[in-house]
Amino acid sequence: MKPGLPKTRKGRLQAALAVLASMCAVDGFFVEPNWIEVTHYSLSAPVAAPLKIAHLTDLHTKGLGFRERRLLQLLRQEKPDLIVITGDTISSTANYEEESVVLRELHAPLGVWLVRGNWENRYTLRGESEFYRANGVHFLANRSAAARPDIWLIGTNDSANWSAEVERAFASVPENTYRIALFHSPAFFSQSRARYDLALAGHSHGGQVRIPFWGPLWLPSGVGPYVHGWFSSGGTRMYVSRGIGTTLLPVRFACRPELAIITLQPMAN
């Protein structure tokens, strides 16, 4: 073996690792955060007619940037009947004005519906209901409403750091309707799952940064075992979306942002 060969191999290894690290950095900071994945799911449900739901969560928007414009483009292509947003549209008080620009661009025949996340609870907006109403959004804070006569939406405050008043939220929901619960922190599923048919949640960002063969680098409190995807218990199902935006650092790795499209199909007789 030539005396200089080990050094050459070491140098090549270091160079390869540097290239790999650079590629991961480019992917994590510039590619993945803007590379929205559209996921499609179909559920058989006791509903009168099909319903196509677009589930958004964790926008953490700062206005109409590239990612938001791409999201709007995808929504126009999907043409959902209903858009639901399960919290964390902002990251600071200053973002509300920027958020309004995005909210005004969201449209669906059965409306846009929103619940608080932990960031809205941290930076509570005075005149919150009026703000959302002015931007064409139905705000569900521990209350319910009919999306259609056979389908009711129930929105609760984020249970991680606010009062989720379950009794109040479900008080006016008629019997024999399909119930869709909207909340931010998926760990709430363990406390409330017997009351509805389907739940939609976010908060986890899917981990945001996932290490291959390991999993999420970090998860916030309020996630529990419900990091991403479908979960079921006692006939109730929940979907946890990876969300659209980022927090702490503007990076995603092995965890693309997600627009979840869930279609309810009438059950066969």
Positions of predicted regions on the chain:
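Catalytic metal-binding/acid-base residues of hydrolase active sites
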Residues: 60, 89-90, 119-120, 144-145, ...
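Binuclear metal-dependent hydrolase catalytic cores centered on His/Asp/Glu-rich metal-binding motifs
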Residues: 127-137, 141-144, 148-183, 187-191, ...
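Beta-strand-turn-beta hairpins that frame and shape the catalytic cleft
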Residues: 42-54, 137-138, 144-155, 176-178, ...
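Membrane-embedded segments
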Residues: 47-143
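Mobile, glycine- and charge-enriched loop segments
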Residues: 31-65, 172-180
